[in-house]
């Protein structure tokens, strides 16, 4: 009998924004214990859109947004199901 791996995903992201009077600043974020790759992609898009909206409301613009979904097995090891996400939400 073949046992399927029980994978979880960790979302690692970085966001850079620019305000005319401040310049460019960046931050990183992590969301862990995501149930599957689809949920990780959805969360990455939700975070990107939400942050872009907040930045624009304050008069700035998003310079860069990157996200990476890292698959981990039950022991916490990275496995070959990880992927980078690119969105054109800028």
Name what the model sees in each region.
Residues 1-6, 88-89:
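Short N-terminal "domain-start" leader segments
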Residues 5-20:
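Hydrophobic alpha-helical targeting segments used for export or membrane insertion
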Residues 23-39:
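A short, exposed loop/beta-hairpin motif centered on an aromatic-Gly-Thr core
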Residues 36-51:
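Short, well-ordered alpha-helical segments
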Residues 49-90:
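Short, mixed-charge low-complexity intrinsically disordered segments
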């Amino acid at each position: 009998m073949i046992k399927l791996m029980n994978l979880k995903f960790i979302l690692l992201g970085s966001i850079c924004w620019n305000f005319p009077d401040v310049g460019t600043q960046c931050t990183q974020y992590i969301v862990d214990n995501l149930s599957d790759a689809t949920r990780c992609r959805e969360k990455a898009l939700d975070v990107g859109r939400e942050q872009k909206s907040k930045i624009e409301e304050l008069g700035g613009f998003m310079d860069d947004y990157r996200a990476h979904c890292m698959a981990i097995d039950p022991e916490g090891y990275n496995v070959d199901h990880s992927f980078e996400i690119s969105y054109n939400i800028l």
